[in-house]
Amino acid sequence: MVTILGVISEEERGYVQRLRELIPGVKLQLTTRAPGTLAELHILVKMAGASGCFVTTPSAKLLVPDAISYTQDDFAGSCLNISGIDYVIMNDISQIVTTPTGKHLAARYLSKLTTPEVWPKTPAFRYELCSTPDEAKAALEVLRDADMIAYDIETVKSKLFFDVISFTGVFIAKHQAAEGWFKYSTRTYTFPHSDEVMQELIKQVLQLEIPKITQNGKYDNAYLIRWGMPPVMWYYDTAHFFHSWYAEMPKRLDFITAYSLRDIQFWKNSGEGSFENRAKYCGRDSWGTACTWMSFMERAPKWAMRNYLQEFPVSIACILPEHTGVELDSEAEGRLREYNIKIRDKKRASLAASVGLPDFNPGSWQQILKLVHALGAKDIKDTTPPSMDKFSVRHPLNQWFAEGFKEYKSAAKVVSNYTKDSVRLTDHAGKQWDKIFYCLNPQATDTGRLGSKESHFWCGLQIQNIKRDEDDEEAVSVKEMFAAPDGFYLGESDLEQAEARDTAYLSGDTALIKAVDCGKDFHSLNASSFFGVPYEEIYQDLEFIDFDGKVTKAGCKNKPLRNLSKRVNHGANYNMMEMVLLDTMGIRNVIKAKYLLNLPEGWGLLKVCAYLLSRFDITYPVVRGDYQEYIKRCIRQTQMLVGPTGWTRYCFADPTGNKRALNSYVAHPSQSLNAMVLNKAWWRIFTEIALVERKDFRLNAQIHDSILFCYRKGRQDLAYKVRDMMQVPVLVKDPYGIERTLCVPSALKGEGRTWATLKDMR
């Protein structure tokens, strides 16, 4: 029987039984002593008769005395053999209970001690710094014979430059055992990006017709493309593959390698100091990437590979839009900045005068909280929206302050986020570009939907969460900043009520299917069904002229009721309970709903919220009934949710006893199906329009349920082609085994010079 020792804290003793359940058949010895030296730790292991030891306390730093900095989370999963004893550094074992992935990770890391034979063999890190062209040429010749090549760069912010690149060649043995792990070796080289000769040699390696491996390679490739060195045969990416396998886990290289390889130690803080240290650090990155990819090929399930084959092409299709960006209208930017500075300064002066403190800062949560307490609301503990909502409804003065804080922060956010100098790209020559760049990331969410953030080049902004337009007629829309190039129009094609339609077909709720497919306004139809008001009093489908010549225009006739139905539908789809719906809608809106619906005076706000949710459940009984039970059953039986396109999510949490997990998993199928459909359309638009109509079309970005693009004036056919490609039919099977074909319709807007001025093109 294998014996291992655990060095834990006294606070972790309550989780020991859970720990024992992860390693049946293993003798587990534990100590809460805190050894002061490595020798003392060795003695503890030998006294326990153990072959290995895991450490969850700060004493683990004794195992890595040369570490420049140390945190337990960074080194978790590191496995070291010291004086013939295997040591594993782990996080606090309470995470077995307190985090969804804690149980899985603890079992994985402990197996480095209990069953080392099941882990793939990690080849030695054979490394060379090629400081001269002759050394680089010799490395190039070796790499020509590699079966795969992993690469990684280190960048310098000031010049948008990379100063070193590493290559790890993977050489697979000719003779492999019938069973067992891949036999392979690696050779790692780093090339300084120091002059044109070295640049040419780097380019030659990248142009070798050998499959390439990266970790989050869009970042590396952005700089390589910038410096005229695009790689060929970029097929493999460890971040995308790990997301395809375990979407709920981190995608950092250090985490992935600790999870995938046994004999690995955290190295991400070893690149400080000399260029030699930086180069070796870069080499370890590409070596870790190569070895991790090989471990994936050895043990990853087929469904993870199927996911990868869906996700990775989307990443490739993101590169061109990221480098294309969107034109920035400098005049609109100036007006936007001027308007919001005026609002910001006016609100700050008004609030400061009201409290009698010239230096009062409404952007400081500490100062706001002090004022809230001074106004008698000492039970308010923070300045989050739900807390400020509670504060505001207690007195008209509170409401005035709360709305003032909100307006100040909104204007200040526009100034700091959208009109800052760093929005523009400043190139290595110091030139500023009137363009907005950004990143689009297919591995940013658990559902497969693209995320966004600032550009790889330290500029730009997150393009998906653009601030909504103000009601004030004088306000300048943030979207006015985003413009089409000369001779082009901007266009946007949007999947209409995509998540509601997805939920209807996935759940098999026939009432909801009828509602989304009948052709009437969905939210007005819901308002009628939820609250018993005739549809015709809420929405007018067609414009008409009566006998007296009076024109009745099409559109919404009762916005408050329609907006209320939208909030209730959103809350129910995301499985909110009364308290969360109250926080989401806000106290004031719930009070409005109470009087709008003539609900009893004696009802409290939570009862109003419960009533609102009950109206959804009565109208669509399957969504929060049989459908939720089906989702819980799938996870209980397989730990997976499989969508109509085959995209599979591994689920670590138990939705039966975890409300947060249940909410996440209930929302997943419709969000993921929407993402998969949008990604299919994205790939088609990229390959069939963007790459073919290069003079007349620009693919810009995914924006949640829509795709933003530019088309040359006179080429409206390309805009309609985008709309048609967005409409992807998918065969969906509901929990009752009934199959239906879902095709979400796509709306189209275009013919606008800016994003704010798009016109309906239906």
Regions found by a protein language model. Name each.
Residues 1-119:
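A polyanion-binding, active-site-adjacent surface
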Residues 2-8, 12-30, 120-255, 259, ...:
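Conserved RNase H-like, two-metal-ion catalytic cores of nucleic-acid enzymes
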Residues 65-77, 82-87, 91-96, 103-106, ...:
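Metal-dependent phosphoesterase core characteristic of DEDDh/y 3'-5' exonuclease domains
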Residues 115-187, 259-260, 267, 274-474, ...:
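Conserved "right-hand" nucleotidyltransferase catalytic core of DNA-directed polymerases
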Residues 149-151, 235-240, 482-499, 581:
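Conserved catalytic palm subdomain of right-hand nucleotidyl-transferase polymerases, strongest
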Residues 158-159, 218-230, 243-245, 369-376, ...:
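Short active-site loop/helix that positions an aromatic residue
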Residues 319, 323, 378, 437, ...:
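Conserved catalytic core of nucleic-acid polymerases
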Residues 724-735:
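A common structural junction motif
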